[in-house]
């Protein structure tokens, strides 16, 4: 298997420390709000990696943390008039429900930051003792100049980072790029109970040391793969490497750094509450977008490339899934799930996934299988190929309820609200002169078993095909 390693800026053959036990750490959610599709893309990407590694190695330890204390959580707790425990428990529950709808496996361990304070204090103490951290007025800072490789992951020079917008300039720092490991408790922290005793005074941890502590607690000072979104590369992951390697001399921390690309909406817009364009997983599910459709959209683009979310991407995913479901509509779910041990994952699917998780190529291979299924008239061969299709798709976390429920959903039991929404979208596209999109929507509706006719007065009528 090959993975693109950000630290080396190249694809590398994956060679774990221990071929019997692979260790993976991925930065998880900060639980103060609903998960949006950018969060969800990252979860799905590393779910595929987890599934692939489980297919290739005897044991995989997958750790994905929960950040349950930070400034955003404290501010949300104050504004919603809840305790931190109530707020974080609520949004953790909703996060789990959302990613369950996307058919994501549970990680091996899911530590919460507040449960690992002692480990954080241990790491901070080691850094101070080794001269990599210092105390100023109850705040503990990491000295970036003490680590000669600082900036290697993000490809930045220390001098260039000083002028960056994410570097906080504070007079008491030895260097403007130094970052917080421990901060004194504010009155609000004390009021909400978001603070703990330490040798440097009552306070709470900085964000970066949380992940170093949780990865160390469950995977040791060095492990195989660290994953996360590209937006976390700097400063979060850069700081993680620095403090972990300095706290444990001789450790390489993570052997491979994997980052998934950015997600935008509506033709390249960055999601923002101020723009009102944040799309949550829960919102999509509530509007009738199936979790499998969401997952398919994510996997249709290579994980390292930018992904733009829009109606067309959803329509394309529905059409593609519909073609796959129809190829197996003569078989029950029980029949397709029986005898899977006698068939293997399609060679082209496995080869694509082993090549830096190339899910678009793997999906293309699934559609080639669909063509073979549709072409053969031999019932036994059709069933064998359908089982290969099912097993191959399962490796990517697809086809959880394959095929019966999905076929019904896609073959005519389409919600009227969804039909009307698509028709309104088509009318709007025609008004704007986007006839290509209008034609694509017509074709999508047709594939769902819906015919439409345009009246001379500009109205559009629809009917279910027989």
Curated annotation (Swiss-Prot):
Pfam families: DALR_2, tRNA-synt_1e
EC class of the enzyme, as a word: ligase
A single GO molecular function term of this UniProt record: ATP binding
Cofactor(s) the protein requires to work: Zn(2+)
Ranges in coiled-coil conformation: none
Binding site for Zn(2+): 27, 211, 236, 240
Reaction equations catalysed: tRNA(Cys) + L-cysteine + ATP = L-cysteinyl-tRNA(Cys) + AMP + diphosphate
Residues spanned by motif 'KMSKS' region: 270-274
Cellular component aspect of the GO annotation: cytosol
UniProt: ATP binding residues: 273
Manner of cofactor binding, per the entry note: Binds 1 zinc ion per subunit.
GO biological process terms, semicolon-separated: cysteinyl-tRNA aminoacylation
Residue ranges of the motif 'HIGH' region: 29-39
EC number(s) recorded for this UniProt protein: 6.1.1.16
Keyword annotations of the record: Aminoacyl-tRNA synthetase, ATP-binding, Cytoplasm, Ligase, Metal-binding, Nucleotide-binding, Protein biosynthesis, Zinc
Location of the protein in the cell: Cytoplasm
CDD domains found in the cross-reference section: CysRS_core
Subunit structure: Monomer.
Family: Belongs to the class-I aminoacyl-tRNA synthetase family.
Family annotation (NCBIfam families): cysS
Protein name stated in the entry: Cysteine--tRNA ligase
Taxonomic classification: Bacteria, Pseudomonadati, Pseudomonadota, Alphaproteobacteria, Rickettsiales
Gene, per the UniProt record: cysS
């Amino acid at each position: 298997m090959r993975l693109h390693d950000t630290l080396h800026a190249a694809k590398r053959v994956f060679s774990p420390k221990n071929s019997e036990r692979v260790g993976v750490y991925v930065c998880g959610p900060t639980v103060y709000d609903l998960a949006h599709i950018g969060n969800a893309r990252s979860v799905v990407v590393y779910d595929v990696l987890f599934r692939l590694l489980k297919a290739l190695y005897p044991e995989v330890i997958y750790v994905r943390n929960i950040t349950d204390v930070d400034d955003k959580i404290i501010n949300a707790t104050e504004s919603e008039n809840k305790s931190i425990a109530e707020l974080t428990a609520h949004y953790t529950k909703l996060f789990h429900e959302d990613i369950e709808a996307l058919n994501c496996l549970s990680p091996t361990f899911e530590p919460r930051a507040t449960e690992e304070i002692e480990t954080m204090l241990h790491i901070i103490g080691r850094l101070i003792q080794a001269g990599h951290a210092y105390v100023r007025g109850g705040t503990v800072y990491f000295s970036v100049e003490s680590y000669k490789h600082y900036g290697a992951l993000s490809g930045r020079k220390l001098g260039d980072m000083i002028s960056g917008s994410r570097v906080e300039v504070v007079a008491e720092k030895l260097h403007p790029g130094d970052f917080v490991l421990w901060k004194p408790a504010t009155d609000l922290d004390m009021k909400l109970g978001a603070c703990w005793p330490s040798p440097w005074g009552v306070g709470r941890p900085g964000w970066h040391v949380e992940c170093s502590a949780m990865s160390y607690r469950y995977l040791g000072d060095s492990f195989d793969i660290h994953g996360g979104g590209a937006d976390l590369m700097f400063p979060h992951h850069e700081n993680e490497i620095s403090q972990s390697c300095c706290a444990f001399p001789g450790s390489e921390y993570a052997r491979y750094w994997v980052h998934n690309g950015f997600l935008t909406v509506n033709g390249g817009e960055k999601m923002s509450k101020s723009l009102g364009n944040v799309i949550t997983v829960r919102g999509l599910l509530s509007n009738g977008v199936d979790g499998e459709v969401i997952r398919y959209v994510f996997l249709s683009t290579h994980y390292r490339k930018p992904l733009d979310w829009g109606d067309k991407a959803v329509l394309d995913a529905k059409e593609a899934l519909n073609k796959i479901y129809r190829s197996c509509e003569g078989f029950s779910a029980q029949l397709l799930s029986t005898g899977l041990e006698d068939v293997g994952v399609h060679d082209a699917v496995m080869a694509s996934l082993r090549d830096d998780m190339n899910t678009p190529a793997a999906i293309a291979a699934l559609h080639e299988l669909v063509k073979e299924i549709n072409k053969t008239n031999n019932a036994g061969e059709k069933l064998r190929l359908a089982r290969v299709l099912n097993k191959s798709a399962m490796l990517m976390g697809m086809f959880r309820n394959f095929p019966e429920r999905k076929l019904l959903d896609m073959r005519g039991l389409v919600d009227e609200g969804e039909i009307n929404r698509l028709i309104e979208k088509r009318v709007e596209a025609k008004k704007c002169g986007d006839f290509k999109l209008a034609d694509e929507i017509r074709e999508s509706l047709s594939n769902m078993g819906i015919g439409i006719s345009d009246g001379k007065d500009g109205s559009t009528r629809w009917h279910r095909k027989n």
